[in-house]
Amino acid sequence: MPEPSIPPLNARLCRRVSALTLLSGLTFFVANLALWLVPRWTDTAARLQANLQAEPIALTPSVQALGLLVSSLSMATLFWALWTARRLLLRLAAGDVLQHETGVRLRQFGVAILAYAGVAPITTALTCYLVTMGNPPGQTLIRLGISDGTLVLALVGTVIMAIGSVLAEAAEVADEHRQII
């Protein structure tokens, strides 16, 4: 029985999106560095990361360094998800569809998305505390919240993990059937 393959158009699409995931990950990393290191952008970076609008914040060099470190945790998790997606897409572009390793890669992508959904609220809360800890007494904030987008990411990550597990199992069953025939 011949190995199922991906049509050429989809293989090209997988290769292109794979390149886009790598470019996106690098862009996010560089943008995060720039937002925290370019002085006129730091206020915007701090407010976006901490989910603050008009509340007073205190940005010192040490707060900037810690803010960069905390936001880098979130960016590292996002980069891991994008890198995993890239590896999965390259397998698909090569025609490795119904194989155990493809299911494992899909499951890893789901885990990475779920991890990003878990890290995002924590980094937001930490950044909120960091940028307000230098405020006058009574104006230090810590906000811990989970947005509907974060919940959807967690759900999608979980579903992708499950589909990856099913695909890995299906590939093993297909291999067993090939050996019988």
For each predicted feature, which ranges?
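Perimembrane loop-to-helix junctions flanking transmembrane segments
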Residues: 43-60
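Alpha-helical transmembrane segments of multi-pass integral membrane proteins
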Residues: 116-181
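Cytoplasmic juxtamembrane regions at transmembrane-helix boundaries
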Residues: 7, 82-105, 175-181
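Juxtamembrane "helix exit" motif at the C-terminal ends of alpha-helical transmembrane segments
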Residues: 29-48, 123-134
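Transmembrane alpha-helical segments in integral membrane proteins
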Residues: 69-91, 158-172
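Alpha-helical membrane-spanning segments of integral membrane proteins, especially the hydrophobic core
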Residues: 12-20, 56-72, 100-117, 144-156
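Hydrophobic alpha-helical membrane-insertion segments
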Residues: 20-36, 107-124
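Cytosolic-side membrane-entry/anchor segment at the start of a transmembrane helix
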Residues: 1-33
